[in-house]
């Protein structure tokens, strides 16, 4: 889960390893700063998992954008409509499943009772473990935009969000 990325990556580079870390690199700006500092300190190669960069249709699209055939690009907007999200029903806390070492799964996250909603895939929708759709899918949309413009940082950012659907479900 995302909440482990910082600790695992720092431990790995401290052990002299090069690292492939899945996106998002960290759960906070501070975690990302710690990770970048560790990679520099231990002179490790670190790659962040942006899998779409390896897809041929993505490379073809970037080649087209970079060809100049679109003219001068003045504005880039990135968004995603997610039609696969489903309501997460409220469930009571439960016993930890057999074979799961829940304390190790929690790791650096705050200690909370086990709840099936905050485990496996759905951990993404709980702040203790991840950053919701922005860090799960938004990082890819921003990556497309930045590569398309051949920049590493945006000039400005505007974001809007909220819990507009399923107001009574269990997601945070």
Predicted regions and their residues:
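Beta-strand-loop-alpha-helix segment that lines the small-molecule cofactor/substrate pocket
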Residues: 2, 6-54, 68
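Short, solvent-exposed loop/turn and secondary-structure capping segments
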Residues: 6-11, 31-32, 58-59, 86-91, ...
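Structural recognition of the beta-strand scaffold that forms the well-ordered cores
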Residues: 19-21, 27, 45-48, 74-78, ...
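Active-site-proximal cap/loop segments of hydrolase catalytic domains
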Residues: 29-32, 38, 58, 119-122, ...
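Basic phosphate/pyrophosphate-binding loop/patch that engages nucleotide-derived ligands
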Residues: 37-44, 60-75, 93-96
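Core domains of carbohydrate- and sulfate-ester-processing enzymes
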Residues: 77-119
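Rossmann-like dinucleotide-binding domain that binds NAD(P)(H)
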Residues: 103-172
